């Protein structure tokens, strides 16, 4: 056994090259044991490597590399490993090889990423030897079937060629595509590179044996390529694959922005008829109404002459199909279907509201109860509670009246067809001026009904805002207009709101500043930013500044690194409200990206800024960035939740609520629990609201603490000595927990994994209730119906059942509160004589004997009852449209005997097109009527009598 390498090292000084080679081979064998000794002579080994004439210089490099590895000098070790060429065996499982490969990949990745950001002429050449090792690694991954590893490294090193090759060579191409798409959505932080990856994915999806159009369109939404989506839809219609086209349209509406959808609609409209065989005949630009009618006629004539044998009666069909697709893309269909689902399945427990109403004693809690009622009935059109308590409701005055009127917009969310009739009583009239608070609230309500789906109502609100003579009406009008025109970037709307902002009126300006951001949502419009930031730096009104702070952030929604320059300048501003705007801008620009740089910035501000509002906003913003990985949030904010600063604690609570909304995350709830007993009342308020955001729609089985929190809300509300702020939080929490008749959840991403824009905006503006209660209503934008709605080829709901393969109690509605029984008045005990006492004693003994005879029968009956209660089925059949919670989707399937087949997996949920495999007549689900005032009935007057001749006697 060798105890020293000195003898071998001395051979390196020999003249004979063979002896040196022999020494190197021996050293290579013992280097792991004697590296310390060899390191003293490593310069000799280096000299051998540098000697061009030495035959085994690669071997010298390998030995030198191993010595430097043991010394911890990884960079030198990597350089010599590269010099060793093929002698460095990437397939070896030693710690040395693993470490050097990791360093090699890191070094290569760094060079590739640096090169990617440089223009073509300035790119630095990459060491071919380095690339060689990385290529060997890729091959090793493919040989070992470690495809996910290869995809990960390929994306990190920006090697799209390897990325594509890996997917195509894998044994599960659809699985690898889904994995890659998920990586793109959640982990990729560079927008330009992400787009290149998506282009590759689109190419692979399209080249599959059976092209996966649904996923292609998901990629195209990310790429912001509406033209390609329109082309796919046209292609599907031409190929008579209508059901697939409808399914894609529903998915697009759920995931894409309004601008994207309107471009697709525009392209579909300007195509004439999809049958036209002339390639490239798509005319762009808006076609005026008169020409539109004549246009298709020309194309029909052309096709008739060009394509012989085409039947003329086939031409109107595609037009009808295109109209249906436009109806779906515009959101009209989805909104109608969700409204039907929410009305049909409304399961609100009015007892909760009644108890709260009886317990509240001041105007703040009165407003909170009105808001909670609107949350509980969001989209159900049921204003039963308000009708039953008109006298109580009438106590709302001034801005409370504004909030109460606007709450009708939340209750009737999506009830667009009768919106103007429903709200007629509250809207501004030409004849007599009504209450300004009521009219402003009415306009705000119209915006809430049509949020992110304005259509014709935008022009109505535009005119109302133009003609408004009162700052309160202008406030409501601006909010309503901002909501209805959300993300449209319409210039006329922007100009009118800007005019209202420049009037320098605090009340109008606050709403106008926020509305400007809503209209320009995610547009990154330089002019809008310049106008808004410029005015924010000039104005003296804090209210206007507050509105603009959120508005500026909204303009940068989803823009990621493109917003960095603006964020930098806002964060350096001396005005704390603009610094707060910087925090919101980080939240909006990087929402859902999990970007480390953004998180670091927010955490730094959270502990270093001198202003409490800025620190609170910074911590809240963490929730928006981390919502794709809610399990990470508790560890990020756990220390902040114990901060000495109550504003930071409040921010931590809200961040947990935003990030883990609807998940029932146990760690988050464990962090919030002690905060519900915080010595500072507004921290308790935040903890109560956040707990409801997390536990919305959770049951005792999915989240054991839900009932404990329900009781806590009730305790806080009914405690006469508790603080108003905590009570406000508890009342709102009750409303959030049972929102939408127990049929909605809150989720910041769509079912397909895209960031859900209305939800993000709704939650951000909701957090501003800290300054302005009426903004609480914005949370209704984030409510997503938890449903599976199956549709047939005519886009009607057929009668069909889904099978939920778990016990019904797992996802059941919570049991309603019991009406407390009235206590009987205690009777005063009367004096009893000794004789009567004896007589009663005898009677009792008689009864006892009789009871003993009866006992056996009754005991048997009791046992029977218990037996009946015991067995709970392991599955449940749900009727279409079905309430299916996100966690329940995994166990959902069609029944075995079902005649319908879904076009995409039921586990995704939402609106699903069903293919009918039977020729029998379909049974359809009857639509239900919406609630609310029925104005039409009142307007029907009796017909005038028949004309007759009046003869005077």
Swiss-Prot record:
One of its GO terms (cellular component) is proteasome complex. InterPro entries: 26S_Psome_Rpn2, ARM-like, ARM-type_fold, Proteasome/cyclosome_rpt, PSMD1_RPN2_N, RPN2_C. The modification Phosphothreonine is found at residues 273, 311, 830. One of its GO terms (biological process) is regulation of protein catabolic process. Residues 290-303, 842-852, 859-872 have a biased composition (Basic and acidic residues). Gene3D superfamilies: Leucine-rich Repeat Variant. GO terms for molecular function: enzyme regulator activity; ubiquitin protein ligase binding. It holds the Pfam family RPN2_C. The modification N-acetylmethionine is found at residue 1. The keyword Acetylation applies. The modification N6-acetyllysine is found at residues 310, 720. Residues 936-953 have a biased composition (Acidic residues). Residues 277-319, 839-881, 930-953 are annotated as: Disordered. PC repeats lie at residues 403-436, 441-474, 476-510, 511-545, 547-580, 581-616, 617-649, 651-685, 686-726, 729-761. The modification Phosphoserine is found at residues 290, 315, 834. Keywords: Acetylation, Phosphoprotein, Proteasome, Repeat. Belongs to the proteasome subunit S1 family. Component of the 19S proteasome regulatory particle complex. The 26S proteasome consists of a 20S core particle (CP) and two 19S regulatory subunits (RP). The regulatory particle is made of a lid composed of 9 subunits, a base containing 6 ATPases and few additional components including PSMD1. Interacts with ADRM1. Interacts with ZFAND1. Component of the 26S proteasome, a multiprotein complex involved in the ATP-dependent degradation of ubiquitinated proteins. This complex plays a key role in the maintenance of protein homeostasis by removing misfolded or damaged proteins, which could impair cellular functions, and by removing proteins whose functions are no longer required. Therefore, the proteasome participates in numerous cellular processes, including cell cycle progression, apoptosis, or DNA damage repair. This is 26S proteasome non-ATPase regulatory subunit 1. It comes from Mus musculus.
